[in-house]
C-alpha cells in the first residue's frame, strides 16, 4: 500500500514538474506583457524594426496563401515576380505559423505574441525534459534552469525575429538526443529534433548543427576510458545526423538552391577582435540598454538566463562528481564559443559565412543554454561540490562590481549603460552564494540532513529565479517600449486594404501590376513591402532572400535601390510603367512628398472616379503592355554603344536605355528617316555657371568630371522646347552620385540612401528650369552625368499599340503543389519573333506554345523569353510555368530521410551490432 502511495506521489510530482516547467515561463511572460501594456493586453505590439517592415508583410501574404488566394510557389508581390519558397524557408517555415489561420488579419500582432509565448514556454519545458530524462527522477530545483532558459534575454530581445525562437525551443531536445544516443537508449529524439531545427529555420538550424558537432566532440572526449561503445557513438551520430538533415531537406535544400545571387553569399570580414568585456556583459540582467545594441553587426550579445543559473554554472567546475576531463572539456566548449564570438572571422563563420546585418550574435542562445545545462549538472550533485567552490562566483561578483563601478572616464556614456549594475541582481547573487556557503558547511557536519536543506534552498531559489528572470525580461521590454509599434498604427495600415480591394474588383489580378504611391504608416526605415502586406502584384520589396541581379536591375530602370531594399518610390517613367504592366496606382494626397511620380497628372494616366473622403486617389494607365507578348528577338542585354569601357560600365543613361528597350521590342515604329523612333529626348542646357574654384573637364565621349571644394555649386539652366510642352519631364543623375545635393527650381531632388532613381519635374509657365548641384564634400575629378529629358507619350502610344497586337490575353493562373503557371492566348502576325514575359528568368521556368515546350531563355537582361521561330501566324495558346526544382529535389531527399528514419527505428541496432560484432570476430 505504501509503495502504491509512493508511486502515485512520485507520478504526481513528475506531472507537476512538467506542468510548472511550461507554466512558470508562460505565466511570468503573460504577467509581464500585461503590466507593460503589450497587445492584446494594451496598446503596444511586439512589432519593431524588421517585423514592422518585413515579417508582418510576409505573414499576411502567407495567410492569403493558406486561404487559397495566393501561391506558395511563385509570387508577383515582389519586384518583377519570383519564387516564394526562398522567403518561406527563411522566414515562415515554422509549423507554429500554421496557426495563423485561426487569427484574422487585424489580429496578426496577437498571433506573433502568443506563438512566441508558446515557443518560450516550450523552451522551458524542453530544458526541463533534457535535465529530467538523464536521471532517475526530477527535482523542483531543475525548474531554476527551466525558467532561466525559457526567459533567456535573447528570446525577449528578439521577440520580433520570431522565426529564430524555434531554434531556442528545440535546442535542448537536440542535446537530449545526443546524450541518449551516447547511452544507446534512444535514437529517435536526435534526428527528429535536428530535423525540426533545420525545417523551421535553416539559418538558425545550421547554427544548431555546428553546435551539435562541437557538443559531440565534447561528449566523446568526456567519455570514460572504460566506455566500450565509442565507435558505436561515432557511427550513430553520423547516421542520425544524416537522417535529420535528410528529413528537413524539403526546406534547407530548397533554400540552398535559391540562395545563389542573394545577400546570403559567402563573405568574410577583415580579421579583428571585438570588445570582449562587452561580450561578457551579455550575461548580466541590464546588458540591454538601447535598441542601438541590436542595430549593429557585431560586438553585442545577450544570453542572460537569471543570475542564479550563472552561479551554479560556475560551481559546476568544482563538482567532484564529474571527472576533471569532463569539466575541462565543458570549459573548453564554453570558452570556444566566447572566443569565436570575439573574433570577426570565427564570428562570421558561426553565422554561416556572412556577417549579419544588425541583430548581432544570432547564436547567443547557445551560450545561454550552456550556462543552464552545465549549471543543472551542478544541482544534480550539489553536495559533491568542493567546499571552496563558491570562491569563484564570489570573486567574479566582487571583481565585476568594482570594475563596473570604475569604468574609464573616457568611455562613451551610452556604452557605459550596458555595464550598469542591477542592485536587485547583485543582492540575489550574494544572498544565493551566502546560502550555498552555509549549505556546504552545514552538510559537511550534518550530511544526513542534506536532502531537507536542499529542499529548503530550492524553494528559496525558485522564487529568486523568477524575480531575476522577470526583471531581465522586463528591462528588455522597457528599453524597447518606444520602438514597439502601437496597435492603432497597425489598424491604420489595415484600413488601406479596402483601397487595394477596390482596384482588384475592377478586373482579374492576373492582368496587371499595381502600386501605392505612399507607404503605410507602420513601415520601418522607409522600407516598402506593401505588395506583400496587401497581397497585390507590385514591385516594392525587401527581404534577405532576393536576387541581387534583379535588385540591381530595379535601379537600372530608374526605380529606387540602395543595396538593401528596392521600391517603386518616384516611379521611374510612364514608359517603364507601361512596359512592366503597372496599370493602377493609388495615391494618398494627405501624404505629401517630392518622391512621387509626376506623370500621373498627364496622359496616359487618368484619375478614376472616387467617392472616398480619405484623401485617396486612384489612377489607371491606358497604355500598358500585358504581362507577356510576342516581340522582336532581342539581345540578352540592352546597351548603348557609348556605355561600354572594355568589360565595365563607364557611363549609363536611364532614358537612352528605356529608348533601347522599346526599339528592341518593336522595330517597325519608324520616323521619316526610316529610323526607329525614340520616346525620350534630351533637353540641352541653355547655360552652365560654376562657382569659384570649380573645374569642369570633358572626356572624349563628352562625359563631365568636376573638381571642387565642399559647398561649391554648379548651376545649369534648361529651356523646354515647344514640342515638349505637354509631355512628362524627368531628371536623373545617371551614376546615382550621392556626393551632391540636387535642387531643381527650388525643389529638392533627393538622391540618397532612402530615395534614388528618376525624378519627375513639373513644367513651369516660362518653361525655364534651373538645376543647382551643391557639392556635399570635396570632389576630385568626379564624374557627374545629370540629364534632363522629356517623354513623348504619343510615340509611346505607337509602340504600345503595336506590341499589344501580339499581346497575351485572358491570363489564367494555375497553382500546383510544386508549380505555378500562367495560361493565355496571343495572335502572332510577324516573322522573327520571340515570346517575352516581364517575369525574371530562373531555373525551372518553361514556356509552352500550343502545349509544346519551346526553348526558353533569359532575355532583356533579366526577363524570360522563348523562340517563336517555327510558330505559324495566327492564334496560339501559351503557358509559362515555374517548377520549383529545388523543392522537388528537397521533397525527394525528405522522403528518403523519412524512409531511412523508419528503417533505423526497426533495424538500426541490429545492423550496428552486426557490424561491430563481425569486426570483433575478425580481430580475434
Regions found by a protein language model. Give the residues of each.
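Start-transfer (signal-anchor) and selected internal transmembrane alpha helices
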Residues: 1-38, 232, 236, 451-461, ...
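Active-site-proximal, structured, solvent-exposed surfaces of multi-pass membrane proteins
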Residues: 3, 10, 58, 673-924
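Membrane-embedded helix bundles of polyisoprenyl
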Residues: 22-25, 117-134, 139-222, 233-261, ...
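Membrane-interface coil-to-helix junctions
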Residues: 25-127, 147-168, 207, 252, ...
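Membrane-interface helix-loop junctions at the exits of transmembrane helices
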Residues: 30-38, 96, 102-106, 140-161, ...
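Extracytoplasmic/lumenal acceptor-recognition loop(s) of multi-pass membrane glycoenzymes
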Residues: 78, 463-487, 504-579, 625, ...
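Alpha-helical transmembrane segments at the extracellular/periplasmic loop-to-helix junctions
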Residues: 93-94, 276-319, 360-371, 422-436, ...
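Contiguous transmembrane helix-bundle modules in multi-pass membrane proteins
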Residues: 185, 204, 328-347, 354-492, ...
Amino acid at each position: 500500500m505504501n509503495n502504491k502511495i509512493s508511486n502515485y506521489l512520485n507520478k504526481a510530482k513528475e506531472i507537476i514538474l512538467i506542468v510548472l516547467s511550461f507554466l512558470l515561463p508562460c505565466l511570468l511572460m503573460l504577467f509581464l506583457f500585461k503590466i507593460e501594456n503589450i497587445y492584446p493586453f494594451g496598446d503596444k505590439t511586439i512589432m519593431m524594426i524588421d517585423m514592422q517592415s518585413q515579417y508582418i508583410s510576409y505573414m499576411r501574404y502567407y495567410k492569403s496563401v493558406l486561404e487559397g488566394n495566393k501561391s506558395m510557389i511563385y509570387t508577383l508581390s515582389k519586384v518583377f515576380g519570383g519564387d516564394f519558397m526562398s522567403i518561406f524557408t527563411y522566414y515562415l517555415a515554422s509549423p507554429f505559423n500554421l496557426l495563423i489561420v485561426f487569427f484574422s488579419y487585424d489580429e496578426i500582432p496577437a498571433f506573433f505574441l502568443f506563438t512566441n509565448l508558446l515557443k518560450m514556454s516550450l523552451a522551458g519545458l524542453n530544458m526541463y525534459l533534457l535535465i529530467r530524462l538523464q536521471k532517475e527522477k526530477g527535482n523542483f530545483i531543475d525548474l531554476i534552469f527551466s525558467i532561466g532558459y525559457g526567459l533567456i534575454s535573447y528570446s525577449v530581445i528578439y521577440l520580433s525575429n520570431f522565426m529564430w525562437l524555434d531554434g531556442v525551443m528545440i535546442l535542448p531536445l537536440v542535446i537530449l538526443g545526443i546524450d541518449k544516443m551516447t547511452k544507446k537508449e534512444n535514437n529517435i529524439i536526435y534526428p527528429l529534433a535536428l530535423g525540426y531545427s533545420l525545417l523551421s529555420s535553416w539559418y538558425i538550424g545550421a547554427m544548431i548543427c555546428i553546435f551539435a558537432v562541437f557538443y559531440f566532440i565534447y561528449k566523446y572526449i568526456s567519455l570514460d576510458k572504460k566506455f566500450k561503445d565509442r565507435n558505436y557513438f561515432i557511427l550513430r551520430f553520423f547516421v542520425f545526423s544524416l537522417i535529420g538533415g535528410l528529413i528537413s531537406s524539403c526546406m534547407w535544400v530548397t533554400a540552398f538552391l535559391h540562395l545563389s545571387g542573394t545577400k546570403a553569399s559567402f563573405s568574410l570580414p577583415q580579421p579583428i577582435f571585438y570588445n570582449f568585456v562587452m561580450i561578457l556583459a551579455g550575461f548580466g540582467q541590464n546588458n540591454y540598454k538601447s535598441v542601438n545594441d541590436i542595430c549593429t553587426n557585431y560586438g553585442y550579445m545577450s544570453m542572460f538566463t537569471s543570475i542564479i543559473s550563472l552561479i551554479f554554472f560556475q560551481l559546476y567546475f568544482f563538482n567532484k562528481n564529474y571527472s576533471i576531463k569532463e569539466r575541462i572539456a565543458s570549459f573548453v566548449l564554453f570558452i570556444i564559443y566566447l572566443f569565436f564570438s570575439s573574433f570577426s572571422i570565427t564570428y562570421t563563420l558561426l553565422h554561416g559565412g556572412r556577417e549579419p546585418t544588425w541583430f548581432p550574435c544570432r547564436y547567443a542562445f547557445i551560450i545561454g543554454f550552456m550556462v543552464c545545462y552545465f549549471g543543472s549538472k551542478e544541482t544534480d550533485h550539489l553536495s559533491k561540490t568542493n567546499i571552496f567552490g563558491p570562491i569563484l562566483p564570489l570573486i567574479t561578483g566582487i571583481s565585476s562590481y568594482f570594475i563596473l563601478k570604475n569604468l574609464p572616464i573616457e568611455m562613451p556614456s551610452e556604452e557605459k549603460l550596458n555595464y550598469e549594475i542591477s542592485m536587485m541582481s547583485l543582492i540575489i547573487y550574494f544572498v544565493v552564494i551566502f546560502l550555498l556557503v552555509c549549505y556546504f558547511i552545514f552538510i559537511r557536519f550534518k550530511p544526513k540532513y542534506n536532502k531537507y536543506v536542499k529542499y529548503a534552498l530550492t524553494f528559496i531559489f525558485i522564487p529568486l529565479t523568477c524575480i531575476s528572470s522577470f526583471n531581465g525580461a522586463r528591462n528588455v521590454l522597457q528599453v524597447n517600449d518606444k520602438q514597439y509599434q502601437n496597435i492603432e498604427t497597425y489598424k491604420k495600415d489595415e484600413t488601406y486594404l479596402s483601397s487595394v480591394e477596390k482596384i482588384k474588383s475592377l478586373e482579374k489580378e492576373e492582368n496587371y501590376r499595381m502600386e501605392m504611391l505612399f507607404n503605410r504608416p507602420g513601415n520601418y526605415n522607409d522600407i516598402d513591402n506593401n505588395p506583400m502586406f496587401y497581397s497585390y502584384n507590385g514591385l516594392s520589396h525587401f527581404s534577405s532572400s532576393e536576387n541581387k541581379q534583379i535588385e540591381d536591375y530595379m535601379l537600372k530602370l530608374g526605380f529606387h535601390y540602395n543595396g538593401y531594399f528596392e521600391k517603386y518610390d518616384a516611379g521611374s517613367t510612364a514608359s517603364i510603367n507601361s512596359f512592366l504592366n503597372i496599370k493602377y496606382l493609388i495615391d494618398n494626397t494627405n501624404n505629401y512628398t517630392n518622391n512621387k511620380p509626376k506623370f500621373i497628372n498627364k496622359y496616359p494616366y487618368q484619375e478614376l472616379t472616387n467617392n472616398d473622403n480619405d484623401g485617396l486617389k486612384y489612377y489607371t494607365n491606358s497604355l500598358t503592355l500585358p504581362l507577356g507578348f510576342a516581340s522582336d528577338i532581342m539581345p540578352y542585354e540592352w546597351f548603348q554603344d557609348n556605355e561600354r569601357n572594355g568589360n565595365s560600365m563607364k557611363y549609363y543613361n536611364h532614358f537612352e536605355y528605356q529608348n533601347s528597350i522599346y526599339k528592341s521590342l518593336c522595330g517597325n515604329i519608324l520616323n521619316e528617316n526610316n529610323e526607329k523612333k525614340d520616346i525620350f529626348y534630351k533637353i540641352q542646357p541653355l547655360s552652365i555657371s560654376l562657382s569659384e574654384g570649380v573645374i569642369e573637364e570633358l572626356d572624349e565621349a563628352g562625359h563631365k568630371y568636376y573638381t571642387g571644394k565642399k559647398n561649391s555649386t554648379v548651376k545649369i539652366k534648361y529651356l523646354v522646347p515647344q514640342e515638349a510642352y505637354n509631355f512628362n519631364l524627368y531628371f536623373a543623375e545617371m551614376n546615382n552620385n550621392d556626393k551632391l545635393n540636387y535642387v531643381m527650381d527650388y525643389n529638392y531632388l533627393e538622391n540618397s540612401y532612402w530615395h534614388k532613381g528618376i525624378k519627375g519635374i513639373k513644367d513651369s509657365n516660362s518653361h525655364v528650369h534651373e538645376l543647382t548641384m551643391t557639392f556635399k564634400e570635396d570632389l576630385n575629378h568626379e564624374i557627374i552625368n545629370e540629364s534632363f529629358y522629356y517623354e513623348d507619350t504619343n510615340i509611346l502610344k505607337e509602340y504600345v499599340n503595336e506590341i499589344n497586337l501580339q499581346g497575351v490575353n485572358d491570363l489564367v493562373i494555375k497553382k500546383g503543389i510544386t508549380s505555378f503557371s500562367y495560361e493565355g492566348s496571343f495572335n502572332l502576325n510577324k516573322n522573327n519573333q520571340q515570346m517575352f514575359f516581364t517575369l525574371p528568368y530562373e531555373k525551372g521556368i518553361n514556356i509552352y506554345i500550343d502545349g509544346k515546350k519551346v526553348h526558353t531563355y533569359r532575355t532583356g537582361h533579366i526577363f524570360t523569353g522563348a523562340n517563336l521561330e517555327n510558330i505559324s501566324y495566327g492564334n496560339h495558346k501559351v503557358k509559362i510555368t515555374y517548377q520549383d526544382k529545388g523543392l522537388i529535389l528537397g521533397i525527394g531527399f525528405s522522403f528518403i530521410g523519412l524512409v531511412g528514419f523508419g528503417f533505423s527505428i526497426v533495424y538500426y541496432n541490429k545492423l550496428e551490432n552486426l557490424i561491430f560484432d563481425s569486426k570483433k570476430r575478425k580481430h580475434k
